[in-house]
Amino acid sequence: MSRRRQIYEGKAKILYEGPEPGTIIQYFKDDATAFNAEKKGTISGKGVINNRISEHVFTRLSHIGIPTHFIRRLNMREQLVRQCEIIPIEVVVRNVAAGSISKRLGIPEGEPLPHTLIEYYYKDDSLGDPLIAEEHIACFNWASPEEMQDIASMAIRINDFMAGMFAAIDIRLVDFKLEFGRIYDGDFSRVILADEISPDGCRLWDMNSGEKLDKDRFRRDLGGESEAYQEVARRLGLLDEDRNNGEGGPGEVFDMSAHRSRLRGTPTPPKK
C-alpha cells in the first residue's frame, strides 16, 4: 500500500491527500492543547469520539441545508472531506458567558447573554488568535461582505439547530467555534462549513448539574475528560449505533423557540 502524503498537521488533526482530486483525509488525534498550545496533553480516545460526533453533527446540519466539507467517515479516526480554502477567521457563537468573554468584560461565568453573540478571531497562533471586528476583515480582505453575510447567517442557523439538538439530551450549548472555507466553481466561489464540531470546540454543560462535558475539563485540570466526551456521544446515541445496526440516534430534536428559556436557565451548581 502506498504511503499517503501528509499535507498538514495541526493541534488536533492531521490532513492527508485524499484518494480523489479535491478531497482530503482528516485524521483525529488524541492530543489536547489549551491556552494557545501552552498546555499540552493527551485525552485517551478523544480522536475516535470527536470523529464520530463531528460526523453526526455535520450530517445533520447538511439535512437543514448547511453546506459542509464533510463527505463520509472512513474509519474510527478518519473522515473524507472536500478540499477548500480555509478563511482565516474563527467564528465563536456565544449563548452564555464563559471563558474569555467573562475575563474580558467581567461578566460572571454562566450568566445568559441578552442575545446570541457572534465574535470573530484572526487565525494566527503566533498572535494568539486575536479578537477582531468586521472592519478588520473588510480592511484586510480576509472575506468579502457577501461571504461575511453568509457566515453570520449560517452561524445563527447552526446555533439554533445545535442548541435544540443538545437541549433534547439535557445539555446546554454555552458557546462553540466554527471555521469556514471557500470552494470554487470556475470564476465563482461559495462558503461552506469546514473543520469539525466536537467537545474540543464547544462548551457543553449538563443542564441539571452544570457539569462540564467539554475540553474545559482539560483546561481547568478537572479530570474525567475521556468520560465527559464519551457521555456526550452516549447521549447523542452514537455509542449504541453498532448494536442498533446503525439506526441509533438521539431521538427528537426540540423546537428552539419553545425551549429557548430552558436552554438559558441558570443551572444548579455542581456538587463538590
Curated annotation (Swiss-Prot):
SUPFAM superfamilies the UniProt entry points to: SAICAR synthase-like
Q: Which reaction does it catalyse?
A: 5-amino-1-(5-phospho-D-ribosyl)imidazole-4-carboxylate + L-aspartate + ATP = (2S)-2-[5-amino-1-(5-phospho-beta-D-ribosyl)imidazole-4-carboxamido]succinate + ADP + phosphate + 2 H(+)
The protein's name in its UniProt record: Phosphoribosylaminoimidazole-succinocarboxamide synthase
Gene for this protein? purC
Q: Where is this region: Disordered?
A: 239-272
Q: In which pathway does it act?
A: Purine metabolism; IMP biosynthesis via de novo pathway; 5-amino-1-(5-phospho-D-ribosyl)imidazole-4-carboxamide from 5-amino-1-(5-phospho-D-ribosyl)imidazole-4-carboxylate: step 1/2
Record NCBIfam families: purC
GO: which molecular function terms? ATP binding; phosphoribosylaminoimidazolesuccinocarboxamide synthase activity
Residue spans making up a coiled coil are: none
Segment forming the signal sequence: none
Q: Name one GO biological process term.
A: 'de novo' IMP biosynthetic process
What protein family does this chain belong to? Belongs to the SAICAR synthetase family.
The UniProt record lists the EC number as 6.3.2.6
Q: Which InterPro entries match?
A: SAICAR_synt/ADE2_N, SAICAR_synt_PurC, SAICAR_synth, SAICAR_synthetase, SAICAR_synthetase_CS
Per the record, a Pfam family? SAICAR_synt
Gene Ontology cellular-component terms for this entry are: cytosol
Q: Keywords assigned by UniProt?
A: ATP-binding, Ligase, Nucleotide-binding, Purine biosynthesis
